[in-house]
């Protein structure tokens, strides 16, 4: 029997203590890199302790294919506890780029048989037979240099060219740079590295090539095997490299890297809360529900980034990935994923708007949601009775707060998720503000009430069907198995624990349940049939027929886990054959795709989770955050989340105004101050929804729940602030909806980080809390308590203060001071308008809802009649095309301003143009009357007035539709 010593070498292990791994470096080894290889040996205590000798121990290594291994003597390194460690250093340039290095250890003993160590990065195998070690050695690859050289094969697509270098396997894309030089921008990816059976190999030189449609197919070396790969342009501005045949065993991990210096910055990655620029960070690409302080975790992730150099990179993997953006990887970034596939996309620009547009052209763009989605929403963590529903809606209308949607968050069902309204719960009365509000005798009554209040309904849901639900303390709730569970289990509609195993049952925050397998068509059809039945049950009578009151679904969850709960274990199995490990991020995409199909463009989603492609199923929100100004868990982090989401293609995005959680509340500021600042950010967000957990001690789930000393629920500054900003958000609808339509057509998001618009200005590279809202508005939310100033960077251009019309020069840091009352609102944030801008708003502030009047079927509510107020900041020639085809153009020069308005329909117009006082104002050549006073101007249908305080010419007229009206002054 062999008398083996207890020796080991496991490259992945962080040994000896304080050393990152037993092979240093573990990865990224180039020809000029010295490599240290250590072995451990137990020299005392029980078991197979033995005395390893330095003189009899050696490292033996060779280039794969060479006939013999060459020895390097091992040297004593150190002693730790019962273990001694020995090492050898492989000198730089011992091997060359592209070499596969094979090695094993010979361990000499005074009291044991000579022991040989071989294995993989994760496993050490001991034997007394040297030939066994030689046949199955440890390996590492000598990577090719970061920079490519030599001959290459190329594929052209318009102004772009894809390249694969024949002698190394480097992949590159070239195209115009910002200066307009053809092929002036070059991005190079080093030959990919893969792990097969615990050993690392590098895809290498091209053996042969064949032209294919839209590209080339190549055969490349990969250690002992060869792979077949394709280089193509699958969509405009996007180059794809994909291995289509591995020619042998599949990898369990793949990685790619590229040179990167300290001047390169990285954005995107999904919805990041910690920083917009992720340079210097290791980014974990894993969907995860981590309420409060999220650190580097995120609900929405994308194996994708946008570089300040004017390109993007997408690693197309649904598995968990790691993006090292110059953290451990120095002078380069490295992307790796635990997957058996390799496909990545280099996305060209060079303009960053074009990068995001090209990326969404490949992965999906958001269809245009219905108009009501862009009005403010009513929501609360829970509605315990129909009386509370009636109270909330009645008070919003009574207190003159415009709203267009009502969200039923959890619980509203009998059980999670049986998609059946709990009519017992909503039949109950409720007493609020010392007044009783009656419940609803029938579901139809509640839906009709909401419809005629001018509201579309959004229903919360999650992808689990429960075997038991938590007790929410509401009447009529089924705490046991949901009534639809057994049917789904019998149909194999749930994700399974293992191949052929039972349904996966996991603990989640609403009980214990099974996730629906959305990769299975039958399962998806089973669930969507229930949702369509729910829509049918919630139909209401419109002016011309019937329509579901429900217009959307709040699609909660879909992440890989929450806290200590794992929702998608590695061993889970989907009907498409993928495991939980392989599809951990892809699950939410199939979930959201399925639910979006129920309503399509007639509705929308409000999704918490997200992944590459889910931006095509609008919209989404920033999840659960805390009501404070903290840079780890509060309002500032949510702004960052919105901007990183935008760089990842998510355009129809919102957040919980006020912060959702009751934890870490407000300190050290007042509740009202935080709520007002969050509402201001909400106004200049695509979706504006107030939502928070319920606290029985207050009414802070409502905008009137923040009275300060000397104020009442009916009259308080926070309520006035919310009313003003929800009204402004509603009035901004023509501007906002136009940009939502632009997102549908181009993928360019509504929120835009400054760097997206000014990538040639390094001052914008790390700006986290100032952004463009569409093309023309620049917004800087206040992110500190009790302040009336805000420092911000104004990018290049001339800017006008939205509130005062003060003109500011760009490309400088400024300190903005809030205008003093009595101008409304009392509390303001920096908002600037770009010189040359044309900004359409709803005329007047009386609109109560953006729902279609045919749906509402209630003449008592004020809806938009099409009237437009247009703010114009003349600078040369500019124009704005409203979503309905209305074109407003402005030409300014030589002391004359000409505004032309082409509208497809008749409507009232109010033009507000920044200008000096004119001598006259003319419509189509005919002079208009100047109003003698503000009152006279308000009463007139046609005329003009000069606002000397703000420097605006105001012009009112009625447009006949189907014609062009010209205004000159």
Segments and roles (model prediction):
Residues 1-152, 157-161, 168-170, 883-895, ...:
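Glycan-association/targeting regions that enable binding to alpha-glucans and other polysaccharides
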Residues 13, 26-28, 48, 77-79, ...:
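Residues embedded in well-ordered secondary-structure elements
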Residues 27-30, 233, 306, 901:
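Extracellular and analogous surface-interaction loops
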Residues 48-60, 70-78, 85-119, 138-343, ...:
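N-terminal accessory beta-strand-rich subdomains and adjacent acidic, glycine-rich linkers
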Residues 135-141, 288-289, 295-296, 340-343, ...:
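Ampipathic, surface-exposed secondary-structure segments
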Residues 138-140, 344, 829-833, 963-969:
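Generic detector of short, aliphatic-rich beta-strand segments that form the cores of beta-sheets
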Residues 146-152, 156, 167-168, 172-174, ...:
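Non-catalytic C-terminal accessory modules of carbohydrate-active enzymes
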Residues 176, 209-210, 219-224, 236-828, ...:
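Catalytic-domain carbohydrate-binding cleft regions of carbohydrate-active enzymes
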């Amino acid at each position: 029997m062999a008398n083996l010593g207890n020796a080991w070498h496991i490259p992945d292990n962080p040994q000896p203590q304080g050393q990152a791994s037993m092979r240093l470096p573990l990865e990224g080894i180039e020809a000029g890199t010295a490599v240290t290889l250590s072995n451990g040996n137990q020299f005392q205590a029980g078991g197979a302790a033995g005395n390893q000798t330095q003189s009899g121990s050696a490292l033996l290594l060779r280039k794969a294919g060479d006939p013999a291994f060459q020895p390097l003597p091992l040297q004593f390194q150190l002693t730790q506890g019962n273990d001694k460690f020995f090492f050898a250093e492989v000198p730089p340039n011992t091997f060359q780029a592209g070499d596969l290095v094979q090695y094993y250890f010979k361990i000499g003993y005074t009291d044991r048989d000579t022991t040989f160590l071989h294995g993989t990065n994760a496993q050490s195998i001991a034997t007394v037979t040297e030939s066994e070690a030689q046949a199955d050695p440890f390996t590492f690859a000598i990577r090719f240099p970061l920079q490519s050289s030599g001959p290459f094969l190329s594929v052209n697509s318009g102004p772009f060219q894809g390249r694969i270098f024949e002698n190394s396997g480097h992949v590159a894309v070239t195209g115009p740079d910002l200066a307009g030089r053809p092929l002036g921008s070059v991005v190079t990816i080093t030959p990919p590295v893969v792990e097969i059976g615990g050993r690392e190999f590098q895809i290498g030189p091209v053996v042969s090539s064949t032209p294919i449609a839209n590209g080339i197919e190549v055969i490349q070396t990969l250690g002992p095997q060869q792979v077949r790969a394709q280089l193509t342009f699958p969509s405009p501005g996007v180059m794809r490299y994909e291995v289509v045949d591995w020619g042998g065993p599949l990898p369990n991990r793949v990685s790619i890297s590229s040179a990167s210096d300290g001047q390169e910055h990285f954005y995107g990655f999904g919805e990041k809360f910690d920083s917009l620029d992720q340079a210097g960070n290791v980014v974990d690409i894993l969907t995860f529900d981590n309420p409060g302080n999220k650190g580097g975790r995120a609900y929405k992730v994308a194996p994708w980034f946008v570089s300040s150099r004017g390109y993007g990179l997408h690693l197309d993997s649904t598995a968990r990935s790691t993006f090292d953006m110059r953290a451990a990887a120095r002078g380069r970034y490295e992307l790796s994923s635990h997957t058996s596939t390799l496909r990545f996309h280099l996305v060209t620009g060079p303009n960053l708007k074009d990068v995001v547009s090209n990326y969404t052209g490949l992965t999906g763009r958001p269809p245009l949601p219905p108009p009501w989605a862009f009005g403010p929403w009513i929501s609360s963590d829970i509605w315990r009775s129909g009386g509370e529903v009636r109270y909330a809606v009645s008070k919003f209308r009574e207190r003159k707060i415009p709203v267009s949607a009502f969200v039923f968050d959890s619980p509203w069902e009998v059980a999670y998720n049986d998609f059946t309204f709990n009519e017992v719960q909503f039949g109950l009365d409720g007493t609020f503000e010392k007044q009783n509000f009656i419940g609803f005798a029938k579901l139809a009554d509640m839906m009709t009430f909401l419809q005629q209040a001018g509201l579309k309904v959004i229903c919360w849901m999650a992808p689990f069907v429960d075997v038991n639900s938590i007790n929410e303390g509401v009447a009529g709730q089924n705490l046991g198995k949901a009534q639809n569970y057994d049917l789904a289990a019998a149909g194999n509609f749930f994700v399974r624990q293992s191949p052929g195993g039972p349904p996966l049952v996991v603990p989640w925050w609403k009980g214990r349940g099974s996730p629906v397998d959305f990769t299975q068509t039958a399962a998806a059809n089973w669930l969507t049939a229930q949702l369509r039945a729910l829509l049918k049950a919630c139909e209401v009578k419109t002016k011309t027929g019937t329509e579901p009151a429900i217009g959307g679904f709040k699609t909660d969850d879909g992440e890989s886990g929450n806290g200590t709960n794992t929702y998608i274990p590695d061993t889970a199995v989907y009907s498409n054959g993928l495991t939980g490990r392989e599809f951990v991020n892809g699950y939410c995409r199939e979930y959201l795709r399925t639910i979006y199909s129920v309503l399509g463009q007639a509705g929308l989603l409000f999704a918490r989770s997200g992944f590459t492609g889910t931006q095509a199923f609008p919209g989404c929100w920033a999840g659960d955050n805390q009501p404070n100004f903290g840079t780890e868990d509060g309002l500032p982090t949510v702004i960052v989340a919105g901007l990183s989401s935008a760089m990842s293609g998510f355009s129809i995005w919102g957040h919980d105004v006020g912060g959702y959680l009751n934890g870490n509340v407000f300190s050290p500021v007042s509740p009202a101050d935080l709520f007002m600042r969050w509402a201001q950010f909400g106004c200049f967000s695509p979706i504006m929804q107030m939502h928070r957990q319920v606290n029985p001690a207050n009414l802070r789930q409502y905008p009137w729940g923040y009275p300060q000393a000397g104020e009442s629920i009916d009259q308080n500054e926070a309520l006035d602030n919310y009313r003003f900003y929800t009204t402004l958000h509603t009035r901004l609808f023509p501007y906002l909806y136009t940009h939502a339509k632009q997102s549908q057509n181009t993928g360019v998001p509504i929120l835009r980080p400054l760097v997206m618009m000014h990538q040639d200005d390094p001052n914008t590279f790390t700006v986290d809390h100032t952004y463009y809202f569409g093309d023309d508005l620049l917004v800087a939310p206040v992110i500190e308590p009790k302040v009336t100033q805000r420092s911000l960077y104004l990018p290049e251009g001339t800017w006008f203060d939205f509130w005062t019309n003060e003109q500011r020069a760009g490309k400088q840091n400024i300190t903005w001071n809030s205008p003093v009352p009595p101008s409304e609102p009392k509390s303001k944030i920096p908002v600037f308008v770009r010189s040359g801008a044309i900004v359409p708003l709803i005329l007047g502030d009386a609109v109560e809802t953006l729902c279609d009047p045919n749906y509402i079927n209630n003449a008592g509510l004020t809806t938009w009649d099409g009237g437009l107020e247009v703010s114009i900041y003349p600078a040369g020639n500019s124009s704005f095309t409203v979503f309905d085809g209305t074109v407003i153009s402005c030409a300014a020069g030589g002391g004359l301003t000409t505004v032309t308005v082409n509208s497809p329909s008749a409507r009232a117009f109010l033009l507000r143009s920044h200008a000096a006082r004119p001598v006259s104002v003319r419509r189509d050549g005919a002079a208009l009357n100047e109003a003698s006073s503000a009152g006279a101007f308000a009463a007139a249908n046609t005329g003009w007035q000069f606002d000397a305080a703000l420097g605006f010419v105001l012009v009112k007229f009625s447009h006949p539709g189907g014609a062009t009206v010209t205004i000159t002054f």
